Amino acid sequence: MQIFVKTLTGKTITLEVEPSDTIENVKAKIQDKEGIPPDQQRLIFAGKQLEDGRTLSDYNIQKESTLHLVLRLRGGIIEPSLRILAQKYNCDKMICRKCYARLHPRATNCRKKKCGHTNNLRPKKKLK
């Protein structure tokens, strides 16, 4: 039977499958066509994420059904030098006490008109 897999980019992939095929088999077929590793694929049908060990018939997926393919979110640690750079960019700021504008670290006056370019500034609080 034929099923369709729709990606987030809107592309539709056509697959030839059997009702007895497992979700793992379907992911392998998607890898063959698109080159996306199965461990990065998440298949959704009728609002449910499909589990690898189950079959298409377990989820009542019939001919010409459409599955939705989303990619797994990747997480992890940031390289130390990039972390320091990001921290400097986001955390080393001065804050206007009147309008809460974020200013560069060496600012002496606020750049906003609404607080009258006040010189009442404080350093941004550090994250714990």
Swiss-Prot record:
According to UniProt, residues marked as the site described as Essential for function are 68
- Covalent link (Glycyl lysine isopeptide (Lys-Gly) (interchain with G-Cter in ubiquitin)) residue numbers: 48
| Pfam family membership, one | Ribosomal_L40e
Q: Which UniProt keywords are given for this protein, alphabetically ordered?
A: Cytoplasm, Isopeptide bond, Nucleus, Ribonucleoprotein, Ribosomal protein, Ubl conjugation
What CDD domains does the entry give? Ubl_ubiquitin
Cross-link Glycyl lysine isopeptide (Gly-Lys) (interchain with K-? in acceptor proteins), residue numbers? 76
List the Gene3D superfamilies: 4.10.1060.50, Phosphatidylinositol 3-kinase Catalytic Subunit, Chain A, domain 1
Q: Which domain of life is it from?
A: Eukaryota
Fetch the InterPro entries from UniProt.
Answer: Ribosomal_eL40_dom, Ribosomal_eL40_sf, Ubiquitin-like_dom, Ubiquitin-like_domsf, Ubiquitin_CS, Ubiquitin_dom, Ubiquitin_ubiquitin-like
GO terms of biological process kind: cytoplasmic translation; modification-dependent protein catabolic process; protein modification process; protein ubiquitination; translation; ubiquitin-dependent protein catabolic process
Q: Is the keyword Ribosomal protein assigned to this protein?
A: yes
Domain Ubiquitin-like: from-to ranges: 1-76
A molecular function GO annotation = ubiquitin protein ligase binding
**Residues carrying the site annotation Interacts with activating enzyme:** 54, 72
What are the GO cellular component annotations? cytoplasm; cytosol; cytosolic large ribosomal subunit; nucleus
User: What miscellaneous comment appears in this entry?
Assistant: In Drosophila ubiquitin is encoded by 3 different genes. RpL40 and RpS27A genes code for a single copy of ubiquitin fused to the ribosomal proteins eL40 and eS31, respectively. Ubi-p63E gene codes for a polyubiquitin precursor with 10 exact head to tail repeats.
- What family name appears in the similarity comment? In the N-terminal section; belongs to the ubiquitin family.
Protein's recorded name: Ubiquitin-ribosomal protein eL40 fusion protein
Origin species: Drosophila melanogaster
Q: Gene that codes for this?
A: RpL40
